[in-house]
Amino acid sequence: MGVLRAGLCPGLTQDMVQLLQSRGIKTVVDLVCADLEEVAQKCGLSYKALVALRRVLLAQFSAFPFNGADLYEELKTSTAILSTGIGSLDKLLDAGLYTGEVTEIVGAPGSGKTQVCLCVAAHVAHGLQQNVLYIDSNGGLTASRILQLLQARTPDEEEQAGALQRIQVVRAFDIFQMLDVLQDLRGAVSQQVSSSSGTLKVVVVDSVAAVVAPLLGGQQREGLALMMQLARELKTLARDLSVAVLVTNHMTRDRDSGQLKPALGRSWSFVPSTRLLLDSTQSSGSLGSWRVVCLTKSPRLPTGCQETVDLGSLGTPAFQGDHKGH
């Protein structure tokens, strides 16, 4: 707990702080654990005032226990499951993106990560009538691509325009810009009022590796700290504001085995609750626009489950698509 200082809580004045410090009571813990009758006599302070002060400090700094039933009820009221609009992905995600969680899509360049993110943004904005923040860090987003996806969903130009208004795009090409965006967003969303256009429900970051990878390795020791700060911001945003966070990540080759693995290392692997791998190399011959999607991390479903999705069909009206489970 913190050091006692004037203004730390109502009723704690500078004169009171000086008197307490003169008797060796310098922190909140010192005051909470002290014999208040003895403190009142030695410091010449009102016993009732000290009791009231301790109650305020306990309320302000203590952790209050919750029973499991209350936590479960809170979870039910704060959690929403948002369909991605892609049937095969929803299967692997146990119905869709969960608010309060970070979901990661991993894949090599050209595997279709951005296409999936754009489809999710278009579906949430049009189909679910909710707002989306799309943070683009690799220049992969264009308004024409989003419009094309919306045109595949509805011929109504007013509906297309309404969906476009629900998708806010921010470009952040380094980690400091991205941290600023997320911190500003947390402050703005915490004060937002639900409107007819819906509240923010999905944050897409495409991609985290683009801003983090340049900071890792070599002598850049601050890189790991900045990466974990970004991780905290994303998880806090998801949990405290009940939004679903969808991020993309690159693949890298393991130095020892030579096998491909998700970038950003072991520390980052604990950030996403769910991780999907987009792979265009499985099966004999070329898959073309088809991709194999493998569930490699999940709190709800067994890992190793696979589905296939046709990226070429994601811009067409019937884009739920053929898919095969394994």
Curated annotation (Swiss-Prot):
Name the Pfam families on file: Rad51, RAD51D_N
Q: Does the keyword Transmembrane helix apply?
A: no
Provide any one GO MF term from the record: ATP-dependent activity, acting on DNA
Q: Which GO BP terms sit in this record?
A: DNA strand invasion; double-strand break repair via homologous recombination; reciprocal meiotic recombination; telomere maintenance
Q: Per its UniProt record, what InterPro entries does this chain match?
A: AAA+_ATPase (IPR003593), DNA_recomb/repair_Rad51_C (IPR013632), DNA_recomb/repair_RecA-like (IPR016467), HRR_RAD51_Paralog (IPR051988), P-loop_NTPase (IPR027417), Rad51D_C (IPR047323), RAD51D_N (IPR048943), RecA_ATP-bd (IPR020588)
Which keywords has UniProt assigned to this entry?
A: ATP-binding, DNA damage, DNA recombination, DNA repair, DNA-binding, Nucleotide-binding, Nucleus
UniProt binding sites for ATP: 107-114
Read off the SMART domains from this record. AAA
A single GO CC term, please?
A: chromosome, telomeric region
Residues annotated as region preferentially binds ssDNA? 1-83
Localization in the cell: Nucleus
Q: What does this protein do?
A: Involved in the homologous recombination repair (HRR) pathway of double-stranded DNA breaks arising during DNA replication or induced by DNA-damaging agents. Bind to single-stranded DNA (ssDNA) and has DNA-dependent ATPase activity. Part of the RAD51 paralog protein complex BCDX2 which acts in the BRCA1-BRCA2-dependent HR pathway. Upon DNA damage, BCDX2 acts downstream of BRCA2 recruitment and upstream of RAD51 recruitment. BCDX2 binds predominantly to the intersection of the four duplex arms of the Holliday junction and to junction of replication forks.
The annotated subunit structure for this chain is:
Part of the BCDX2 complex consisting of RAD51B, RAD51C, RAD51D and XRCC2; the complex has a ring-like structure arranged into a flat disc around a central channel. In the absence of DNA, the BCDX2 subcomplex XRCC2:RAD51D formed a multimeric ring structure; in the presence of single-stranded DNA it formed a filamentous structure with the ssDNA. Interacts with SWSAP1 and ZSWIM7; involved in homologous recombination repair. Interacts with BLM; required for stimulation of BLM activity by the BCDX2 subcomplex XRCC2:RAD51D.
What family is it from?
Belongs to the RecA family. RAD51 subfamily.
Q: Indicate what this protein is called per its UniProt record.
A: DNA repair protein RAD51 homolog 4
Organism from which the protein derives = Bos taurus
What does UniProt list as this organism's lineage? Eukaryota, Metazoa, Chordata, Craniata, Vertebrata
Task: Report the gene name.
Answer: RAD51D
